[in-house]
């Protein structure tokens, strides 16, 4: 009798477990407006809405044309579903944007160019590419020196946030004097002024975004627009952060020195 009672209890518990799990599974189905298909995975993935237009430094860019729309769609999906990387960049922005924004403003550079720094280095101040670009703005050594940074065996100012930003501003000003268009300036930062100038002349394009370029540069301009969209309204793209989640500014002090530092740990 005792044995039967235990079996009865186990059977009843199993039945209850199944009864409880069915509504949970049904509740996790993904139903679109057109189809009633049950998902085989316990979550839904939906594409972010592509806006009809984007604004970069006051310039309205029409995204309704199919090729622009699809290129923007690609980058929005990339940032939306690169969950950990995008989340980390949003957190880092709280640390670095307050430093960068006044420097851009003081140099007459559009505030939107802070997003270029995001796609260059993921807001990692010690980022270094396989090609040798370094810092938040990913300057190559030759370009860094051209725009006033000291780069040698002892000093590398590409890692100095304020000085590297000032150098980036000098580049932006020079490029804008040539193109008169900030989006062309951003494309040249990736591909080089020589290439963008030659392609603008060769392709007779009215806008840099319409140039047929290498994939990296072609994506670069739309990545710039997409990251602005995501950072401007992270909640809309599923990134829900509290103030305490954001990375704070790092306190520091300046120490003057007149000799080389061979051993930093002993300095």
Residue ranges with predicted function:
Residues 37-79, 128, 135-138, 152, ...:
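Catalytic and substrate-binding regions of cell-wall glycan-acting enzymes that process beta-1,4-linked
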Residues 91, 95-98, 102, 114, ...:
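Solvent-exposed, polar/charged alpha-helical surfaces in well-ordered, non-transmembrane soluble domains
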Residues 236-267:
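Low-complexity, Gly/Ser/Thr/Pro-rich intrinsically disordered linker/tail segments
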Residues 131-153, 165-168, 172:
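Substrate-binding/active-site groove segments that recognize
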Residues 79-90, 102-103, 123-130, 150-161, ...:
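Second-shell loop/turn segments in exported
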